[in-house]
Amino acid sequence: MIQSKRQQGASFEYQARLFLERQGLTFIAANQRFNCGELDLIMQDRQTIVFVEVRQRKNQIFGSAIDSVDWKKQQKWLDAANLWLAQYDSSLEDADCRFDLVAFGATTNDIQWIPNFLDE
C-alpha cells in the first residue's frame, strides 16, 4: 500500500522520536502547529527544551534533507518555537533551548542527527 506524504512524514517523525529517546531525550510534544509554521517534535534534554525539525529526502536531486532547511524555514522554526514558549510565559531570550535537525535519506536507517543545527 502506498503511503501519503503526510503518513510518510508521520512515520519518519515517529522514528526520529524513538531515535532521540534512545539518545536520552524525553518526548514533550509533536506536530505543534502555528500560523507561522509547525514544530515537528519538542523534546527535553536534561533542562534544555529541544525543538526538532525532521526532514527526509529519498534522493538528492534537489539537495539533501539538510540542505532543504533554508533561511526561510529556519525563521519559521524560530517563530513557531517562540510562540510555543509564549504559551508558558517564556521566550527564546530566557528559555534554555536549542534547535536540532534529524535528517533521513531514503530509509529510516539512513539517519543523521545534528544537535544545535541553528548554531552551525
From Swiss-Prot:
One of its GO terms (molecular function) is nucleic acid binding. It comes from the Bacteria. SUPFAM superfamilies: Restriction endonuclease-like. Belongs to the UPF0102 family. This is UPF0102 protein HS_0739. It comes from Histophilus somni (strain 129Pt) (Haemophilus somnus).
